[in-house]
Design a protein with these regions (language model features):
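Basic polycationic patches enriched in arginine
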Residues: 2, 13-14, 27
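Intrinsic disorder/low-complexity segments enriched in polar/charged and small flexible residues
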Residues: 6-8, 12, 138
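Short, positively charged low-complexity motifs
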Residues: 1, 7-9, 22
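Short, Lys/Arg-enriched N-terminal segments with co-localized hydrophobic residues
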Residues: 23-34
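Polytopic transmembrane helical bundles with strong interfacial aromatic enrichment
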Residues: 34-167
Length: 167
């Protein structure tokens, strides 16, 4: 019996066989798994973006306006390791999901680069602090510039991933 017809689509009512039912259940299970993975990927990338925006727009300006130079330096020395560790922790589920479920190399490359730049930013912290303490202005400028570069790359790649997942 025909239920509806359009210009090129015909829907028919057919009895459900065991084969059709089992294949439909498998498709539903795969769809739920893919949807859950996609939601997790979107969630973790947006968390990374949120951490960066919070740090750039709220934390840093307030620190320099509210604290003297020595207190600001102490605060930033304690916050930056936590900042990069949080980004590393948030990037790991993205890597895990993509390496388990995603055949595309592009998404894996993007996620690996987010994690790599977070680790690089974390590893630059001792160099940045030592350069500042010893008055090595060129080394400090380079290390600080690399830290800013890492943050920009992480932000850009996380936003790219977000738009790829929702697109």
């Amino acid at each position: 019996m025909r239920l509806w017809s359009g210009s090129s689509i015909w829907l028919e009512r057919r009895p459900v066989t065991a084969e059709v039912a089992s294949s439909s259940l498998v498709r539903i299970a795969i769809l739920k798994e893919n949807m859950t993975s996609q939601i997790a990927l979107i969630f973790f990338n947006l968390l990374i973006v949120g951490v960066i925006f919070t740090h750039l727009l709220l934390t840093t300006p307030v620190v320099f306006k509210s604290l003297d130079e020595a207190s600001a330096a102490n605060f930033l020395r304690s916050i930056f390791p936590r900042y990069y560790l949080l980004i590393i922790i948030l990037s790991l589920p993205v890597l895990l999901i993509l390496f388990l479920y995603e055949p595309s190399g592009t998404l894996k490359w993007l996620a690996a680069n987010v994690s790599f730049h977070a680790v690089l930013g974390f590893l630059l912290i001792p160099l940045t602090n030592a350069a500042k303490d010893r008055g090595w202005d060129k080394v400090f400028s380079f290390a600080h510039g690399m830290s800013v570069y890492c943050t920009i790359v992480i932000l850009a790649l996380s936003l790219i991933q977000f738009f790829l997942y929702i697109g």
